[in-house]
Amino acid sequence: MGKVYDWFEERLEIQAIADDVTNKYVPPHVNIFYCLGGIVFTSFIIQVATGFAMTFYYRPTVTEAFASVQYIMTEVNFGWLVRSVHRWSASMMVMTMILHIFRVYLTGGFKKPRELTWVTGVILSVLTVSFGVTGYSLPWDQIGYWAVKIVTGVPEAIPVVGAPLVELLRGSVSVGQSTLTRFYSLHTFVLPLLTAVVMLMHFLMIRKQGISGPL
């Protein structure tokens, strides 16, 4: 086993990478509130894992979506637990994200030279809210349907571009199968991919610049 490790170590310098990841100076003023960002990330990982598990059973059609969710909850082994954890971690992600934003703002973590870290954080907050909006519609029950109808109808008040924007969001003039398909694609593919990329940028900036000092 030692020879195998030495072979990889010689080529990839694994120990140097491990030392860089595990050994980082932590300022003495850091407290438990500085862990909120890590909790958001952990919640996101749980979301990805549980969401991926549910894609094996969920059917993104207006006629089968609700029934497939009921099937997950009542027939699939531990399906109720997987979906419940998905919902709980979603709430945890939103709550800790809000607290994280407040912590960064109140401690001045957005100031020079960390402006871009703040910008990527704001983008991540928008993506997180988008997760909530798109995911809320997927069970395609009364609450989900009317929530989508209201949310997608908001841009209609914008002059000139309002109506085309509503049609772009819904996939048609009215809420229906095209809307559910778009929201499902956004929720399971587009948003997770964008979030992962922006999170990576966010973390790399934090690693490069370190944790901001006290006020």
Swiss-Prot record:
UniProt entry keywords in alphabetical sequence: Chloroplast, Electron transport, Heme, Iron, Membrane, Metal-binding, Photosynthesis, Plastid, Thylakoid, Transmembrane, Transmembrane helix, Transport
InterPro entries: Cyt_b/b6_N (IPR005797), Cyt_B6_PetB (IPR023530), Cytb/b6-like_sf (IPR027387), Cytochrome_b_N_euk/bac (IPR048259), Di-haem_cyt_TM (IPR016174)
One example of a Gene Ontology biological process annotation: respiratory electron transport chain
Pfam family, one: Cytochrome_B
Main localization, broad class: plastid
Keyword Heme: yes
Residues that, per the record, bind heme b 2: 86, 187
Cofactors named for this entry: heme b; heme c
Gene Ontology cellular component annotations, sorted alphabetically: chloroplast thylakoid membrane
Compartment(s) of residence: Plastid, Chloroplast thylakoid membrane
Annotated binding of heme c, by residue: 35
Listed CDD domains: Cytochrome_b_N (cd00284)
Co-factor binding comment: Binds 2 heme b groups non-covalently with two histidine residues as axial ligands.
Residues at which heme b 1 binds: 100, 202
The UniProt record lists the keyword Plastid: yes
Annotated transmembrane regions: 32-52, 90-110, 116-136, 186-206
Example of a GO MF term: metal ion binding
Membrane topology designation: Multi-pass membrane protein
Assembly, per entry: The 4 large subunits of the cytochrome b6-f complex are cytochrome b6, subunit IV (17 kDa polypeptide, PetD), cytochrome f and the Rieske protein, while the 4 small subunits are PetG, PetL, PetM and PetN. The complex functions as a dimer.
Note: Heme 1 (or BH or b566) is high-potential and absorbs at about 566 nm, and heme 2 (or BL or b562) is low-potential and absorbs at about 562 nm.
Task of the protein: Component of the cytochrome b6-f complex, which mediates electron transfer between photosystem II (PSII) and photosystem I (PSI), cyclic electron flow around PSI, and state transitions.
Family from the record: Belongs to the cytochrome b family. PetB subfamily.
Protein name per UniProt: Cytochrome b6
